[in-house]
Amino acid sequence: MSKFNRIHLVVLDSVGIGAAPDANNFVNAGVPDGASDTLGHISKTVGLNVPNMAKIGLGNIPRETPLKTVAAEINPTGYATKLEEVSLGKDTMTGHWEIMGLNITEPFDTFWNGFPEEILTKIEEFSGRKVIREANKPYSGTAVIDDFGPRQMETGELIIYTSADPVLQIAAHEDIIPLDELYRICEYARSITLERPALLGRIIARPYVGEPGNFTRTANRRDLAVSPFSPTVLDKLNEADIDTYAVGKINDIFNGAGINHDMGHNKSNSHGIDTLLKTMGLAEFEKGFSFTNLVDFDALYGHRRNAHGYRDCLHEFDERLPEIIAAMRENDLLLITADHGNDPTYAGTDHTREYIPLLAYSPAFKGNGLIPVGHFADISATVADNFGVETAMIGESFLDKLV
């Protein structure tokens, strides 16, 4: 019999809690990540007021320097620790795949200076359309269509851009480049980015409509991902007929592998929380695992190095945390964590190599305290242990620490 009937894992995308031991092996604009500290620097520079996460034990997580504005609780309501990444990457897919039990020894490729000419030329030759070279760099998805949408409407050229993650995105106005053509081009791009020097996690079709100054991305987005190279704990759960629910971009990250209920993309963190609450309230969800990603911290504020916005986003999540707790059933377990760092006060615009926090709460808890510092995959090992399935490649369960 499972200790917890349901486990809800919520990933606060990029909410790191201090430089990892190997952080100096990773760089941002030429600066090693060794001094990065997403939560620490936000707390220090703009203040951080997250009483509900603090109540569970956020301020109790061991650090060289305590979080300046998040005090340790004498009697927290849950358990807390920080976890280290072992995989050779600091991107979204690597972080999530490791959380689910994989060790990624060959990281995906990211393109901070845009894609090589060879890739763009192949896409041009296949599609018969030119590529707007000025867009070929990490770009905000809304900004890139504002900047180059008018030109695309005039010329029919392709808008190809990337981000901090190993993705190639193609934006196309639906009245200029029909959806079936866009999807066909994306499928070709997928076929040429499956190995080095361009091993990409996802190709994303980004259709939009509207007029210059008033463009809107549509729901016709399509993701062409790669599946994890080895079974994850999601697959193990699925094989055991244990329900798995994905909220936000989780289904895309795993290419649907091991997920039997995709609850859809999030329009915002708030919308994602609404979807999680709806999922938790499903009468048929009596036993199983929900996996939620809230990406606004990373996409809207981390990469844009906006510490005030990042702080406010954390406040907004913390204000809604009581709703999540109220939706829990007696034998539910809530795990709150991250997938990498993205220090909004740091050099560059890339993710930062950091520990991730882990907060654990259940109405059934009799105890509280610290869990020993571990690794990302310990989360999936704990989920597997709870439901009586095999672990994946790596991870040590801390289930017996939760009492």
Curated annotation (Swiss-Prot):
Mn(2+) 2 binds at residues 298, 303, 351. It catalyses: 2-deoxy-alpha-D-ribose 1-phosphate = 2-deoxy-D-ribose 5-phosphate; alpha-D-ribose 1-phosphate = D-ribose 5-phosphate. Binds 2 manganese ions. It is found in: Cytoplasm. Keywords: Cytoplasm, Isomerase, Manganese, Metal-binding. Its cofactor is Mn(2+). GO terms for cellular component: cytosol. This is Phosphopentomutase. It comes from Streptococcus pneumoniae serotype 19F (strain G54).
